[in-house]
A protein has these predicted regions:
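Flexible interhelical linker loops that connect adjacent transmembrane helices
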Residues: 36-67, 105-120, 181, 244, ...
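12-transmembrane solute porter fold
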Residues: 18-19, 27, 35, 84-89, ...
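Membrane-embedded alpha-helical segments in integral membrane proteins
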Residues: 2-17, 42-44, 65-76, 140-144, ...
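ATP/adenylate-binding site constellation spanning eukaryotic-like Ser/Thr protein kinases
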Residues: 8, 30, 66-67, 185, ...
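Membrane-interface helix caps and helix-loop-helix hairpins in membrane proteins
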Residues: 47-51, 76-82, 208-209
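Helix-loop-helix hairpins in multi-pass membrane proteins, especially solute transporters
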Residues: 1-58, 243
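C-terminal membrane-cytosol helix-exit motif in multi-pass small-molecule transporters
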Residues: 29-48, 64-76, 92-107, 294-302
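A generic secondary-structure micro-motif detector
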Residues: 1-2, 103, 133-134
Length: 308
């Protein structure tokens, strides 16, 4: 994941140097097609199919409606949607979401394993993951605007500078993985998110006369903290689930990541709607606060024992 994250901004900068911005989206079409056929060819079939369990379109539609309404309500405030529509969306989200959760709790093979959230250390790891990925997406979406409006970088320069964040993760994440057996993952996650929060706060209050190096070390600080957090948190989340439920746990891990990323992007839009040009600084400030909350959540896991 870190290598792909490094390649993303660099490739985007290269594409923008020779083509217009629509190509940033068009390039994903052939990549997606190739990935689809590679997945069909090399990924193993789900063993559940052998047990006679079929894909449930009803569950899929309820899942899409629940998360779609949730994200839509968060984003609606940034698009001047009438309050009555927003309230209607919130009520619909509560009703459909409640029905969906109750249905999932009765399923033997649920699409989302809400029953695993009854395990304290598992649920705390999910919360920590959501907070951290929300903060990460707040930062990654807001930073290009900060670099373009405050520091007047072009698209190519912005992409190259943004590479410094994931580049550090490439080196830090494997080291964090090696420390999992020696240091409690809650400590690694707490320290990592604290470091990331320092980087976010430094970017939020960055002076306008800051040069390239000043920007790079702040971004690298964020990447270092996130890299130190991610691997230990993933390990603790997966290992806290029963061995026969690791597949379900990995699904919840991906869901937590996507919820955080989607909410983070929606919050940036909301901040731009509320605060205009100062939104990038406010987004970095909010990201710093969320990472501190995530650090606290991570450290709280020190008092919770792993399930037997």
């Amino acid at each position: 994941m870190a290598i792909a994250s490094v390649a993303g901004p660099t490739l985007a900068a290269g594409i923008l140097s020779v083509a217009s911005w629509p190509w940033l989206f068009a390039i994903n079409v052939p990549v997606g097609v190739v990935t689809f056929f590679m997945g069909r060819r090399y990924l193993p079939d789900n063993a559940v199919r052998v047990l006679g369990h079929r894909f449930s379109w009803k569950e899929a539609l309820l899942n899409a409606a629940t998360f779609g309404l949730f994200i839509g309500c968060v984003e609606a405030y940034s698009h001047d949607v009438p309050v009555t529509w927003v309230l209607g969306g919130i009520v619909s989200f509560v009703i459909i979401g409640t029905f969906y959760v109750r249905m999932q709790l009765r399923e033997r093979y649920p699409m989302l394993p809400f029953d695993l959230l009854k395990i304290p250390i598992f649920s705390m790891s999910v919360v920590t993951s959501i907070l951290s990925f929300t903060a990460q997406m707040l930062s990654l979406v807001a930073m290009p605007f900060l670099l373009a409006t405050t520091f007047h970088y072009d698209a190519v320069g912005t992409g190259l500078l943004m590479t410094s964040w994931p580049l550090v993760i490439v080196f830090v994440a494997p080291l964090a993985g090696l420390m999992i057996g020696k240091v409690h993952p809650g400590i690694l996650g707490g320290v990592g998110l604290t470091i990331m929060s320092v980087g976010c706060f430094c970017l939020s209050f960055i002076p306008t006369e800051t040069g390239h190096f000043g920007l790079v070390w702040r971004l690298m600080l964020c990447g270092m903290g996130f890299g130190l957090f991610q691997s230990p948190n993933n390990h603790m989340l997966l290992s806290s689930a029963p061995p026969q439920r690791t597949g379900s746990a990995s699904g919840m891990l991906a869901t937590a990541r996507l919820i955080g990323q989607t909410v983070g992007a929606a919050l940036v839009a909301l901040l731009f709607h509320l605060y205009g040009d100062s939104a990038p600084h406010d987004a970095m400030l909010l990201a710093g606060i969320l990472t501190l909350c995530g650090a606290f959540s991570s450290c709280c896991r020190l008092k919770v024992s792993m399930p037997k």
